[in-house]
Amino acid sequence: MILLTFHTRRLVSHAYCGLKPASQKKSIALEMTRPSSNLADFREAFAKAKHIAVITGAGVSAESGVPTFRGAGGYWRKWQAQHLATPEAFARNPSRVWEFYHYRREVMLTKNPNPAHLAIAECETRLRKQGRKLVVITQNIDELHRKAGSRNLFDIHGSLFKTRCTSCGRVKENYKSPICPALDGKGAPESDVQDAKIPVEQLPRCEENGCSGLLRPNVVWFGETLDSNLLGEVEKELETCDLCVVVGTSSVVYPAAMFAPQVAARGVPVAEFNMENTPATTSFTFHFHGPCGTTLPPALARHETELIS
């Protein structure tokens, strides 16, 4: 992870490298147009596309029962997620932050992909057999795309099920439940629950020989930058795709909020599937309103021009 200094050539042209909510950023100037909701027209663009980039956010997982931590109900205990998901919060109170992430991990172990995740994964597999390409660029850290079967996957904000040692830097998959004995039964989200105040030495620790450093979730926190190599790969996909599909994103967290509008700016069709309009909606070719699990499967289903294999 490169901090502070990384800038891509085009996609992050305004230094939107750090993970930040839109309230801390200037708004993007968008062309004010009304996107189409004509599914037949989208399907025509879909049939012609050879390289599809699918960008997903929290909305695609909401139908799996995953808490989004947005809006008036977006609290864990009395804290908003953006106040817990920071390096400063972890430095001040690693026990509280680990309780929060332990809760999220335990919730996710009970969740399954919904029809939107499955439609994306099935489409990727089907198009691969036709010599076409579909990649998924997700802001989600829940791994539901991977669980659904997606393979060309960029988890740009990391994963709940990977840890990083604050001492040696080792990143490792971790699906333990609980992740450590001291967190067993902890992390309840209700506002009247008190912090467990777990001693730091009892929190998740690195198991590398001679290390035993404190582990942290391997996710990108607010104020941190995305991995430069990963962001460079994402940039290449977005610069070469000929169709972009945006699913369940709020378009308010940077740098991901810039991805689809800049694809649209080079004349590539962009289709948004969401429960509501976003700050970027008017820059897109298509907008399909409704639950992603309902609207997306027919949009990505086999087209009549596709060869059956």
From Swiss-Prot:
The active site is at residue 157. The keyword Cytoplasm applies. NAD(+) binds at residues 57-76, 139-142, 248-250, 274-276, 292. Its cofactor is Zn(2+). GO terms for biological process: peptidyl-lysine demalonylation; peptidyl-lysine desuccinylation; protein desuccinylation. It catalyses: N(6)-malonyl-L-lysyl-[protein] + NAD(+) + H2O = 2''-O-malonyl-ADP-D-ribose + nicotinamide + L-lysyl-[protein]; N(6)-succinyl-L-lysyl-[protein] + NAD(+) + H2O = 2''-O-succinyl-ADP-D-ribose + nicotinamide + L-lysyl-[protein]; N(6)-glutaryl-L-lysyl-[protein] + NAD(+) + H2O = 2''-O-glutaryl-ADP-D-ribose + nicotinamide + L-lysyl-[protein]. Its main location: mitochondrion. Binds 1 zinc ion per subunit. PANTHER family: NAD-DEPENDENT PROTEIN DEACYLASE SIRTUIN-5, MITOCHONDRIAL-RELATED (PTHR11085:SF10). In contrast to class I sirtuins, class III sirtuins have only weak deacetylase activity. Difference in substrate specificity is probably due to a larger hydrophobic pocket with 2 residues (Tyr-101 and Arg-104) that bind to malonylated and succinylated substrates and define the specificity. This is NAD-dependent protein deacylase sirtuin-5A, mitochondrial. It comes from Xenopus laevis (African clawed frog). The gene is sirt5-a.
